[in-house]
Amino acid sequence: MNMGDTVFMFVATVMVMLMTPGLALFYGGMVRSKNVLSTTMHSYSAMAIVSIQWIVIGYSLSFGPDWHGLIGTLDWFGLNGVTYVPNPDYSSTIPHNLFMMFQLMFAILTPALISGAFAERMRFSAFLIFILLWTTIVYNPVAHWVWGVGGWLRELGALDFAGGNVVHITSGVAGLVLAIFLGKRKNINGTSPHHLPFTMLGAGLLWFGWFGFNVGSALSLNDVALTAFINTNIAAAASALTWMLSEWFFQSKPTAMGAACGAVSGLVAITPACGFVTPFSALLIGAIGGVLCFGAVFFLKTKFGYDDTLDAFGCHGIGGTWGGIATGLFATTAVNGDGANGLFYGNAALLFKQLVAIGATYAFTIIMTYAIIKAINFFLPVRVDEHEEHMGLDISMHGEKAYEYTERVN
């Protein structure tokens, strides 16, 4: 065990934990004032439910002894055998239970990200059931495929440094499925974010926490971690700039929300690649990611007519997909000897492996998410009724208001 690495991972874990409250602010500022508490409750509920699920079965299903490359066994049920003694399969320099806690923060954040797609219209009780089932049936298997010892995508050689597939594609695609299943919100013409300073503050906390998310995925304070640190920042900066420039060109003015969404999109795009590419490649990945995610939010969503409330798919699904492809293009063993060279360094096979991983994640997530929400809806209506939606979910679902001084309802 290395004390320096252990302290480093303690700090990284706490930083990633901060991302979920940051996401609550980021999403909360974008919805109408009558739905801000219900939106933030989604993130905090994920912290509670997934923490318990992870301790009981989730960690074992994700990282436990392999079963046919598909999922972990329940040998580590209730953290049986998961102690402070390092597990060299994952890291020989930090306690095994610290690695478990670091990965828990990823598992918490992922279903919270999904909630942006169906904000303002999903019944809270249905959401709680969905979190538990989705984490168990979708997140845990995909995490094992990509990161677990023996997982089939790991054995294939697909690369995902910090969760492009595991976190962002799964959450973005699941969000799209739910947005389509629940249908559009009522009376949304002319609505606007109720508190953009919340969103800007949330974006700042996400940017800060993302250093723990990406850099901590090195699991050691080494040269790869420092490269991931640089790459994370430059990709966010480049994406924020290209999103703003895209807004300026297509909509006449750059906006504060555009800057925030652009930064987050760049952070998403660099997530799978941050420990495998050079800083200049990270700049390109972020810059292109900003343009692609802007296009998904302002053109793709309009063309197909789905109501992805806070653009979970546009930012996370598209950003994660681009990041996975970009890893297959820009990865180089000069940055990380444990990785592989991508297409631009003479190895077309890596790009093929990345595409297989992305395709498998899309297919599995779409099928399982639809099955889960369809099953829940059979027993419990997942969408609030029209009166509850008009009243606002803060009152109809939670019996409280964020702002007692205002009577405005839009």
Where are these regions (language model features)?
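Glycine- and aromatic-enriched membrane alpha-helices
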Residues: 1-410
